[in-house]
Amino acid sequence: FETKSPVDGAVLASVARGDAEDIDRAATAASLAFKSWRDMPATMRKKLLLRVADAIEDNADDIAVLECIDTGQAHRFMAKAAIRAAENFRFFADKCTEARDGLNTPSEEHWNISTRVPIGPVGVITPWNTPFMLSTWKIAPALAAGCTVVHKPAEWSPVTADLLAKLVKQAGVPDGVLNTVHGFGEEAGRALTEHPVIKAIGFVG
């Protein structure tokens, strides 16, 4: 499908219209990558997510300009949002080593123990406004926790989702850990929320 800029109505890109089959392929990839990502030492996951943050910072101006053209929002807002996206990855990278910290809260009558484990492949569905930053708001904590992700960005502003996926790959994050499927909510989005491999869904907006 074509995505158009709200600034002047110009066609920005031709975008793959993902469907249930594409979601299934992405979910399968996320499932296959889950065990090794889950079992990767937290310090290594932290290092990779910090590399993603660095890559976002290095490309912040390009991200901001693309966001402006794709969403129609002002550069002064999108420039700050791009930096915030890097900060999101840094914040959650620092949480990698705490991701499985449980609690031991004994009382006189009970001994209460909580544990944390990565739930598995998760879906992330993000909105059209400030799409890059809001995507990192859900993707970064999921990756830090040891989950793998299938991301379905809003069809109204899909351009920077591809850039995020490329930066994540360039940073050295293994294949299958982050998977992006474009498409419409009633097709790709619905298939994602109903897929049996996907253990949880994160919505933003």
Language-model region placement:
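A generic short alpha-helical patch detector that favors 3-5-residue windows
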Residues: F1, D22-R25, A55, S114, ...
